[in-house]
């Protein structure tokens, strides 16, 4: 590798000796590869078209055959072949064939021809070195076989793996489509603080930092919820934020400590209204990104055509295990029944509601392949959701599961400040007892609720997991350009 780099550095010097700057300032590529391919698809084999073209990109392959040479040049949209002929280029032919390597960025001007083999080509009349690469590209046939290297050196992955480029193109389309869908319905995006004096809005461990001037401990936000609700109190009736969230938790194919979510709040709505909003928005996004509402994920066809299945957590657990949690008078009875069914009974699940959630996560969650809204969660695991209008002990909350993964979470928001204080104080007691993910009491948020918050439906969608679905990606690292990785060595 060091010898190859030295050779390329020698070529940098040679280019300068010949009056060619190896690191150019600018070039005007008037044409893109994909557009050339489509606009000139009718050019017959063996014929030329006398139209001036200018393209720029990275040299992916090169073949020198005596007085002829063929390069493959790639830009963001695709590739095109360069046809180089000594008779036409003169001394420049020797320069380009001896000093340009695979990986270099060059610009060329010329005309179009289609080879006898049917390959549309730019017949090069002049060339410009734009950037001399000092490192070789990965093998073009095998790409980056080392998956971790794909994540560590994403720039190489993007150069040699078209599917990776398509994944991030679709991610960008997904984000744009979500914002457009919400904007068209008069939702207003307002940015909320990333650095917060109180980490709230979710059960998660925060990252902690310190403001030197104020001598103040601060947290990277674990959710945007509490500040967006303050905005609803302030009179913004339809508000959202799409942005980064930070949670000091484990790394897996489903979790990255830094991830993207969109949270949406609509005054005078409830969780049933959020169901309609969620399935309508996601179906629309899928149509725009994938061309329809049916797609294949890891070999399984997924149908995102609304309406989607709705079922309560109690119904799904009973369907999967035969256990009716409404019949249990206390935790001991629920634990005994779960043990008899071979379900785990962790000590931290200290109530019937928490055991119901454990049974759901163990026996149901992974089997929810087609989009399913799971409704009506236990109150003790949902401290920010409104009590159910007709089911004691439950709240008006749903989670959306697709391919066995939670993709969205929504509530009829809790707007009673007294009830909210009691729930947050219970959370704070759990934190004091050692639960690092329990929330604390945010006094300013409670004061905002006391000013008065209208009935509100709230929704959060994990953008990364949604993009995994829309790009058929098995790992969250595949859809985050630069995922967090353990340092090498």
From Swiss-Prot:
GO terms for biological process: lysyl-tRNA aminoacylation. Binds 3 Mg(2+) ions per subunit. The keyword Aminoacyl-tRNA synthetase applies. The keyword Nucleotide-binding applies. Keywords: Aminoacyl-tRNA synthetase, ATP-binding, Cytoplasm, Ligase, Magnesium, Metal-binding, Nucleotide-binding, Protein biosynthesis. Its cofactor is Mg(2+). It is found in: Cytoplasm. It catalyses: tRNA(Lys) + L-lysine + ATP = L-lysyl-tRNA(Lys) + AMP + diphosphate. Mg(2+) 2 binds at residue 406. GO terms for molecular function: ATP binding; lysine-tRNA ligase activity; magnesium ion binding; tRNA binding. Its main location: cytoplasm. It holds the Pfam family tRNA_anti-codon. GO terms for cellular component: cytosol. Mg(2+) 1 binds at residues 399, 406. Belongs to the class-II aminoacyl-tRNA synthetase family. HAMAP family: Lys_tRNA_synth_class2. Homodimer. This is Lysine--tRNA ligase. It comes from Synechococcus sp. (strain WH7803).
């Amino acid at each position: 590798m060091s010898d190859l780099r030295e050779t390329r550095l020698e070529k940098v010097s040679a280019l300068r000796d010949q009056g060619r700057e190896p690191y150019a300032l600018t070039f005007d590529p008037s044409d893109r590869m994909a557009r050339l391919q489509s606009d000139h698809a009718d050019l017959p084999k063996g014929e030329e078209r006398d139209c001036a073209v200018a393209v720029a990109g990275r040299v992916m392959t090169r073949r020198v055959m005596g007085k002829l040479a063929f390069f493959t040049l790639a830009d963001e949209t695709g590739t095109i072949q360069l046809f180089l002929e000594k008779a036409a280029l003169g001394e420049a032919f020797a320069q380009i064939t001896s000093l340009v390597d695979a990986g270099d960025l060059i610009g060329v001007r010329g005309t179009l021809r289609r080879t006898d083999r049917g390959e549309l080509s730019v017949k090069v009349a002049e060339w410009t070195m734009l950037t001399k690469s000092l490192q070789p590209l990965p093998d073009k046939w095998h790409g980056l076989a080392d998956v971790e290297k794909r994540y560590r050196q994403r720039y190489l992955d993007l150069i040699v793996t078209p599917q990776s480029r398509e994944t991030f193109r679709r991610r960008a389309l997904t984000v744009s489509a979500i914002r457009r869908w919400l904007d068209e319905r008069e939702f207003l995006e307002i940015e909320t603080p990333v650095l917060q004096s109180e980490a709230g809005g979710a059960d998660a461990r925060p990252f902690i930092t310190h403001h030197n001037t104020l001598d103040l401990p601060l947290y990277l936000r674990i959710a945007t919820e509490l500040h967006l609700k303050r905005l609803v109190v302030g009179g913004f009736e339809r508000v959202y934020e799409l942005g980064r969230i930070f949670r000091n938790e484990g790394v897996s194919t489903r979790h990255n400590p830094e991830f993207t979510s969109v949270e949406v709040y609509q005054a005078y709505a409830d969780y049933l209204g959020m169901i309609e909003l969620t399935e309508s928005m996601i179906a629309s996004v899928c149509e725009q990104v994938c061309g329809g509402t049916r797609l294949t994920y890891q070999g399984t066809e997924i149908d995102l055509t609304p309406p989607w299945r709705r079922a309560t957590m109690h119904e799904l657990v009973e369907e999967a295990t035969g256990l009716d949690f409404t019949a249990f008078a206390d935790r001991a009875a629920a634990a005994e029944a779960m043990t008899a069914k071979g379900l785990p009974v962790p000590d931290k699940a200290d109530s019937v509601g928490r055991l119901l959630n454990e049974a759901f996560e163990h026996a149901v969650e992974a089997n929810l392949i087609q989009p399913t809204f799971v409704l009506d969660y236990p109150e003790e695991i949902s401290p920010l959701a409104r009590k159910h209008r007709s089911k004691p002990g439950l709240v008006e909350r749903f989670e959306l599961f697709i391919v066995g993964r939670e993709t969205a979470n929504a509530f009829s928001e809790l707007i009673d400040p007294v009830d909210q204080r009691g729930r947050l104080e219970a959370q704070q007691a759990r934190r004091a007892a050692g639960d690092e993910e329990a929330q604390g009491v945010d006094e300013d948020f409670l004061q905002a609720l006391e000013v008065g918050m209208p009935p509100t439906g709230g929704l959060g969608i994990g953008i990364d997991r949604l993009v995994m679905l829309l790009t058929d990606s098995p790992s969250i690292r595949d859809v985050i350009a630069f995922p967090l990785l353990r340092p090498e060595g």
